[in-house]
């Protein structure tokens, strides 16, 4: 049995923590500074992926006001447009630093957005834009900015309120309308209710599970409410909350889970804790890069690593796999 330090293990399921930030809401014209647009867009700079929570039932407008039969597709298009225009504005406002120069000048303007020179270069080629003595038109700048957004900022859609009338029909329509987007149906109210009930000892529930167990101390009123939640959970194949986080981490960002240990025979740290840490890294991460993530000194004095499952030595350029248990061996100081 594992003894997690940086995460938790519930009924054999390892839950690895990630940083989730609740961003300020957007209103139309956010890229021009309206509302809290600047605060939101500044936060986007450091995000690996965005989860856009929309009202799939169509009972609120773009500013969160109650309304009847709104089109949830408008929410998706609205956010995409605002971020696209924000990327465009960044380039246009700095155009004097780009005009007449080469593609490196474009990358220098976009460095705060974690966009590599290779991506900038590739997208310019994809759009057949000149990369020396740049004189792109405003339309070409806009097309380039849109491509940059598509490549650098992943947006996943959490279609919430799936339990309300007409929501399922609207959800199915969204999936057809945006075939290239990741859209998940979410029942956040149900997830919250079950987590609270679990804390109070009324149910046994693991986040992400398709059902739950009611315990003996549940009142008739609580049983009735929980039965309704169970019905929706079954129809939706879960609440969708954990599934959304999993999709963001594993599908969008292509993360894998790797377990560092000090004792490759017992899968433990120096204190005997079994699989104490679970670390999320990008698919394609090497043993050396993993060592650097644990501590920079480990990477500097890296000798080799050990695959604890196979009991074999692995080199610094070994590409890690999901579920690997790894010991890093470094030179003694």
Across the structure, where does each feature detected by a protein language model lie?
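Single-stranded RNA-binding surfaces
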Residues: 68-78, 86-109
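Secondary-structure transition/capping residues
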Residues: 51, 61, 90, 94, ...
